[in-house]
């Protein structure tokens, strides 16, 4: 009879093979053991390293400890207290669950495990040795908690040991692991030593407030990061994104400040990283740089598979596209909110109630109160830059035939260079238009188009200093503010009720005052195209916005709606027009097209915007 070729490997060899996946270097050992301490409920963890971890790794914690009866199994393969069924595997919240780390580590090192639970009078120590990895137990002296010592890593696998880097390099990797874990666990104290010298000491925070968490982030990522970062809190259903994202000006040529976590588990997930980098594409971040961020994604554990990578560095989302778009929209909204505030500062129009530490951009968060979030917008709201403007290309649909005819004549006319029209205007004594209150560009005046066709009784003549439209009506000249015209056009378009669904519904929590205001605004908001549902949760009204007017789709909706609920605005179109994207450059064709559109729908309001100018004094001198 032939000797069988297939046989079962001895435990030590099997464990060493498994260690090839789990134990890559000393930092891998530290990660596995510290995660075990966290699962044990420890709030203070001591990490002692000697010679980069090759000589000694000692992890001491004050967790729940391991009873004598469980010590032997703790070092066995596929033995764990974390899961016991397939259903548990699909709902994992613990950091460890496979039950192979201690067995794998003990197969390539001299490992001793000393532990004592609170209900046990004395501590016991366990270690495994020999070909069969038999576990021996003996009494020891130890406080409540656990200490694991890993000595002479890879002593029995010389090939693995020779691939270790210098002590300094290996300790750098250990330091990074501790930093990553400490970022996710601000309520845990960590102490890291190397060769008897304390290198890191992170004290546990007093509470779980954002301010306390921020202290831990600053201690690890630096004050420069936290001073140039936006706090984000974005939620939709079972998805919750929170943390800090750095402004584009602190992006880095390397990805050493890219920290992402899923349900408290540190990882480098491609879906998360891609969504965040895509969100920064619309910013002025230098090409090739990496954004700086510390973000935490909380998700229903049944919607994510953490058992897809040997070292658990990656996960697989059941609805990857939804998660990607959720993160993308959250980060984009945060960056957009900051860009608006920065631009407001540039034009010296500060938002009075803005505070840096409030979560001003987290449109999906569930705990936004008016006293913290409402932002009062002045009449001179910051103007977005031209690169962020929607397409205002001229169109003739819905415009009167006379306007279409005029537009055809306009585009066929050559542009004639003329004298600066500003020099020809002498306003009446009581005329002080806002358009001339700003600093005037003294550069060469732009070409002016002069036309003879009229829109209704309006005859557009020229663009003045890129701020006003010069008109003639009934032998009288008028100036029309282009900014006010753009806002009026925005108002008239809002009344059409054209709406667009949100990819991720916007969730808002209202206080009592906001709730009263909401009750009076339900119908007007619905008429403008908003689709908003409400429900009561813990005595508080919560709104879910699923559809908004098309013109507001790209705006900071959370900020706008909370400001509306805090205001006493009656005309909603006028209120929303404050947020209209106003171009910084105008062509005569655009201005005429807007005039033609608005003249049809808001003629009386348009009449109120014109300001008469008198050329008689100039003409008398000619």
Swiss-Prot record:
GO terms for biological process: mismatch repair. The keyword DNA repair applies. SUPFAM superfamilies: ATPase domain of HSP90 chaperone/DNA topoisomerase II/histidine kinase, DNA mismatch repair protein MutL, Ribosomal protein S5 domain 2-like. GO terms for cellular component: mismatch repair complex. It holds the Pfam family MutL_C. One of its GO terms (molecular function) is mismatched DNA binding. CDD domains: HATPase_MutL-MLH-PMS-like, MutL_Trans_MutL. InterPro entries: DNA_mismatch_repair_CS, DNA_mismatch_repair_MutL, DNA_mismatch_S5_2-like, HATPase_C_sf, MutL/Mlh/PMS, MutL/Mlh/Pms-like, MutL_C, MutL_C_dimsub. Keywords: DNA damage, DNA repair. Belongs to the DNA mismatch repair MutL/HexB family. NCBIfam families: mutl, PRK00095.1-1. This protein is involved in the repair of mismatches in DNA. It is required for dam-dependent methyl-directed DNA mismatch repair. May act as a 'molecular matchmaker', a protein that promotes the formation of a stable complex between two or more DNA-binding proteins in an ATP-dependent manner without itself being part of a final effector complex. HAMAP family: DNA_mis_repair. This is DNA mismatch repair protein MutL. It comes from Actinobacillus pleuropneumoniae serotype 3 (strain JL03).
């Amino acid at each position: 009879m032939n000797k069988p070729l297939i046989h079962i490997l001895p435990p030590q060899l099997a464990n060493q093979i498994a260690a090839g996946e789990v134990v890559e270097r000393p930092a891998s050992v530290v990660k596995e053991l510290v995660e075990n301490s966290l699962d044990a409920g420890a709030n203070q963890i001591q990490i002692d390293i000697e010679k980069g971890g090759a000589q000694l790794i000692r992890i001491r914690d004050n967790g729940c400890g391991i009873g004598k009866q469980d010590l032997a199994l703790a070092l066995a393969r596929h033995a764990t207290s974390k899961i016991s069924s397939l259903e548990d595997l699909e709902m994992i919240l613990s950091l460890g669950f496979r039950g192979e780390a201690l067995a794998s580590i003990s197969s390539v090192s001299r490992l001793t495990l000393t532990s004592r639970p609170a209900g046990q009078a004395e501590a016991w120590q366990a270690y495994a040795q020999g070909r069969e990895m038999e576990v021996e137990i003996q009494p020891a002296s130890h406080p409540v908690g656990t200490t694991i010592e890993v000595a002479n890593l890879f002593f029995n696998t010389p090939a693995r040991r020779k691939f270790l880097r210098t002590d300094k390099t290996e300790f750098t990797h250990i330091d990074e692991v501790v930093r990553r874990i400490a970022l996710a666990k601000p309520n845990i104290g960590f102490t890291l030593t190397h060769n008897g010298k304390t290198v890191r000491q992170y004290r546990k925070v007093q509470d779980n407030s954002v301010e306390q968490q921020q202290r831990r982030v600053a201690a690890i990522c630096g004050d420069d990061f936290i001073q140039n970062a936006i706090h984000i809190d974005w939620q939709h259903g079972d998805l919750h994104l929170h943390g800090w994202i750095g402004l584009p000006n602190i992006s880095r040529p390397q990805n050493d400040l890219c920290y992402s976590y899923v349900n408290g588990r540190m990882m480098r997930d491609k879906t998360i990283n891609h969504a965040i980098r895509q969100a920064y594409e619309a910013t002025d971040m230098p090409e090739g740089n990496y954004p700086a961020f510390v973000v935490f994604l909380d998700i229903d554990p049944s919607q994510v598979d953490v058992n897809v990578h040997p070292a658990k560095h990656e996960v697989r989302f059941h609805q990857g596209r939804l998660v990607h778009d959720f993160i993308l929209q959250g980060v984009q909204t945060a960056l957009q909110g900051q860009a608006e505030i920065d631009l407001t500062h540039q034009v010296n129009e500060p938002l009075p109630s803005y505070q840096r530490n409030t979560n001003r951009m987290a449109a999906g968060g569930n705990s936004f109160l008016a006293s913290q979030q409402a932002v009062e917008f002045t009449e001179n709201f910051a103007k977005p830059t031209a690169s962020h403007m929607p397409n205002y290309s001229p169109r003739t649909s819905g415009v009167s035939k006379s306007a279409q005819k005029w537009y055809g004549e306009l585009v066929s006319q050559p542009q004639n260079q003329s004298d600066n029209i500003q020099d020809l205007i002498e306003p009446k004594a009581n005329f002080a238009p806002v358009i001339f209150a700003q600093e005037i560009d003294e550069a060469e005046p732009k070409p002016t188009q002069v036309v003879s066709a009229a829109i209704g009784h309006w005859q557009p003549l020229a663009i003045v200093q890129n701020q006003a439209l010069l008109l003639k009506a009934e032998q009288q000249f008028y100036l029309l503010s282009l900014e006010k015209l753009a806002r009026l056009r925005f108002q008239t378009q809002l009344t059409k009720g054209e709406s667009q669904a949100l990819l991720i519904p916007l969730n808002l929590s209202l206080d009592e005052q906001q709730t009263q205001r909401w009750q009076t605004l339900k119908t007007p908001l619905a008429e403008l195209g908003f689709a908003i549902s409400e429900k009561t949760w813990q005595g508080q009204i919560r709104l879910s916005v699923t559809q908004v007017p098309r013109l507001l789709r790209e705006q900071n909706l959370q900020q706008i709606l909370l400001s509306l609920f805090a205001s006493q605005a009656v005309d909603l179109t006028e209120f929303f027009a404050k947020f209209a994207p106003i171009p910084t450059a105008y062509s005569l064709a655009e201005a005429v097209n807007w005039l033609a559109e608005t003249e049809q729908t808001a003629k009386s309001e348009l009449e109120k915007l014109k300001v008469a100018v008198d050329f008689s004094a100039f003409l008398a001198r000619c």
